[in-house]
Amino acid sequence: MKKQLQFKFIGVLVVASTVLTLNSCKKDTPASEGVSFEAVLASGGEFAPFSNEKNLIDVTTSSVPVDSGNWNCTNTTWNVMQGNQDFPLYDPNVSVVYPGSLLQGASLNNATPDVVAVKRGGGTVSIDIINGSGAVYVTVPEVKKSLITQALNDIIYNNNAVMPARFTFQHEVVKTKEELALALGLNVEIVPVTVVANLSFSNQSTMNHYLVVLKQSFYTMSYDIPPSYGDFFDPSVTPIDLAKYVSPGNPACYVSDVTYGRVFYLLIESSSSLMKIEAAINVSFSNAPVSGDLNASYLSSLDDLSVKVIALGGTTSSTFSAISASQLSTLTNTLAQSADLNAGVPLSYVVRTVYNNKLVKNKLDIEYTINDCQLVP
């Protein structure tokens, strides 16, 4: 609060001095006299550093008698703080996320971040593929959505190729919707409707849940960092124009990198034990990172199996509904298909502050309770 008041007080002094100058000189004086881009950008402050932590907050127990024995329950409440280097995208059509886009720092964890709507200077975007091509970057006269989109299309047109079906493979147990959100890199409050609808938990208490993520990154598009603050903006933009979008706790940020590709999120549910589910997942997906092959027979052996899938990118539709064990071959065929570069969708993006180009972490701070109940005869 002290910092915020100080910023406002300085702003009053600047305006007052400008009024005095106008009255005494009786000539047009720029409203931004005495204010620099650096001062405005510094007023936004920096994101407080933090470390990944998982702390046990509370433990309670209860026992409920039933005809066959007692339900003994343990409720554990956890607080988790987690930071990732990139921000995930579950809506490929989000129009404000592209290399070079200026965003308001306080809105980065919103479903759609708020923009800094000032006229931009020129900029350069490039692809990270090393293939001997002489057309891996494009310089645009103004950084804006339409010109950047055309630049990216031009780069892809000159560097298009078929990508082999190589994936990264991750899996973890998720016991609550909050743990699912953490695994997806999202705050619970902004989990997209498609995720809620397609990866909803079974209401049966006997079911165990595993999230499997198969991600294939095609390429990353990067925005060249401008050498000075003024190079971010068109010459017509003044520091006062920028100050409308910057305030203490709301620094100006920009998208430095966007990674494109395809990804499959599988929520695997079964009444089998966690140990059996994990073993089946490891065997089923052991070849997926290299060839995209899925040995569905091991998953099919699980009891009361349900597989819910979201697929983004490639030649697939944006989402799949739940599939049964007998339909796993469809997923197997989809994973094994190679994909063109032009079939990639934005999967994640990296954000930096304009003031000092520091990376901004995707901060997740979630508290949740796990209910673990066992029937004791």
Indicate where each model-derived feature is located.
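Bacterial Sec-dependent N-terminal signal peptides
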Residues: 1-5, 12-47
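Membrane-permeabilization and membrane-interfacing ectodomains
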Residues: 32-377
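Intrinsic disorder/low-complexity segments enriched in polar/small residues
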Residues: 3-9, 290-294
